[in-house]
Design a protein with these regions (language model features):
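Interfacial segments at transmembrane-helix termini and the short loops linking adjacent helices
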Residues: 58-60, 119-137, 259, 325-355
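Membrane-interface junctions at transmembrane-helix termini in multi-pass inner-membrane proteins
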Residues: 23, 27, 83-94, 142-168, ...
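Interhelical loop/hinge segments that connect adjacent transmembrane helices in multipass membrane
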Residues: 3-5, 9-26, 161, 165, ...
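Signature of the first transmembrane helix
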Residues: 24-79, 110, 175, 233-260, ...
């Protein structure tokens, strides 16, 4: 596939033209961002569907933990910088400074991932195969970290369509290669290794084709790189703790229950992110617009969009709950080739938690736009401590139901804390003005 795409003749020029040109940039931005975000969100879902049909429930449980762990460390790589980069309308930092900082954080991501795997393997007595799957999943996600800096830059240049096309094509082809590997090799580790090498080469090709169109004569100032890392540290800490909070039940299940139960929890937790995903389709293109509104003190329009977004989250949550009540268990059981009838209540509880997850994500974005992001780490820190203390208690006593209820309670607490911080931030900004 790579050889066909990267043909130095006509095919390469066609691909370059496709990536860089859109008849209607705004329309293409929405469509391709939606497609790419959906594929990114459902990447694990599709992979799990193939695993449950080609391998077994144990392998699905290993994948669920590996994917959750890799995504946790991906937050170190991305450093919570995407929304800050896109909303940097004053161009406080240039792209080379964003990219240099991303290389630093990605190296840190790799180091921390390896340390975690060594500790977790020793503590939980992982098999060698499980250990290597987690390591390669972390390497697989490093590509997402590097790519995100370029996608953020293209979005900053009002070319979200280019970013969306890159992400969509890479996701489709990577999932295809991983799936074919599982079907023909029946080996999760080998399939993951092949997919990792493939997606790395794919990213290199896409960046080579697109970046020259946006390249500017810029220099990297070391002082500004460290300043960027300092400014975004609260965002990173918030993103890291947020992901830990959302996945704390999975880590407790890994320590206390079986890999098969881990797989079942992962199956019913999948729809949780649908709410945030659907909300992201609508809200992501609005970030730069709302940032400009805030900068130009168009408060009425700013708050109108804010309340519209809250309403949208509520509607999406209600629709998803209704759909899950009627079709959730049959559809998920069919998708994952597993009987999930005993987990219907847990599914509904988790989906409600997903609504509060989306709401907290909106609050986080608004706090970043109005530049009170330092407060986020405090809120996440409080809830993360609660998650660390309560996760083993809930899971040990109530198993999967305990994990589901705990998730909902943590999301509600997070929303309450952020709502208070946001209101204080608005009042402070008004008084400063």
């Amino acid at each position: 596939i790579l050889l066909i795409l990267y043909d130095r003749g006509n095919n390469m020029n066609k691909l370059k033209h496709f990536l860089l040109n859109s008849k209607n940039i705004n329309k293409s931005s929405f469509i391709w961002n939606m497609a790419g975000s959906m594929l990114m969100a459902f990447q694990s879902v599709i992979m799990l569907m193939i695993i449950t049909r080609t391998l077994n429930l144990y392998e699905a449980g290993v994948f669920t933990l590996a994917y959750a762990s890799a995504n946790l460390f991906l937050n170190i790589g991305k450093y919570g910088m995407r929304n800050f980069q896109v909303s940097d309308v004053k161009r406080q930092f240039n792209f080379k400074e964003y990219n240099t900082s991303r290389i630093i954080t990605t190296l840190l991501m790799l180091i921390v991932s390896l340390i975690y795997v060594v500790i977790a393997t020793s503590k939980n007595d992982y098999s060698m195969n499980k250990t290597w799957i987690i390591i390669w999943m972390c390497l697989f996600k490093i590509v997402d970290s590097i790519e995100d800096a370029y996608l953020g830059y293209y979005q900053q240049e009002n070319r979200l369509d280019v970013a969306g096309k890159m992400l969509t094509l890479r996701m489709i082809l990577t999932i295809l290669v991983f799936g074919l590997g599982l079907i023909f090799l029946r080996d999760q580790l080998m399939s993951l290794m092949i997919a990792t090498v493939f997606t790395t080469l794919l990213l290199i090709m896409f960046v080579t084709l697109t970046y020259p169109a946006f390249r500017k004569e810029e220099s990297v100032h070391k002082g500004k790189v460290w300043e960027l890392l300092r400014v975004c540290f609260p965002l990173f800490l918030g993103c890291f703790l947020a992901f830990y909070i959302g996945n704390a039940p999975k880590y407790a299940i890994d320590s206390l229950l079986s890999d098969e139960m881990q797989a079942c929890y992962g199956f019913i937790a999948m729809p949780v992110f649908v709410i945030g995903l659907l909300n992201n389709f609508i809200f992501s293109p609005m970030i730069a617009r709302m940032s400009m509104m805030w900068k130009e003190q168009q408060n009425k329009d700013f708050f109108r969009l804010f309340w519209i977004q809250i309403l949208i989250i509520g509607i999406i949550t209600i629709v998803c709950e209704a759909g899950a009540f009627v079709l959730g268990v049959p559809v998920l059981s069919m998708l994952y080739n597993t009987d999930l009838a005993p987990y219907k209540t847990e599914l509904l509880v988790l989906l409600l938690g997903g609504g509060f997850l989306a709401l907290s994500g909106l609050f986080v974005t608004i706090m970043t736009i109005i530049r009170i992001q330092n407060s986020q780490a405090i809120g996440y820190g409080i809830v993360a401590v609660c998650a660390y203390i309560l996760s083993p208690i809930f899971v040990r006593k109530y198993a999967v139901m305990g994990a589901s209820v705990l998730y909902l309670l943590l999301m509600i607490l997070l929303c309450i804390i952020f709502a208070i911080m946001m209101m204080i931030g608005f009042k402070k900004k008004r008084s400063d003005a």
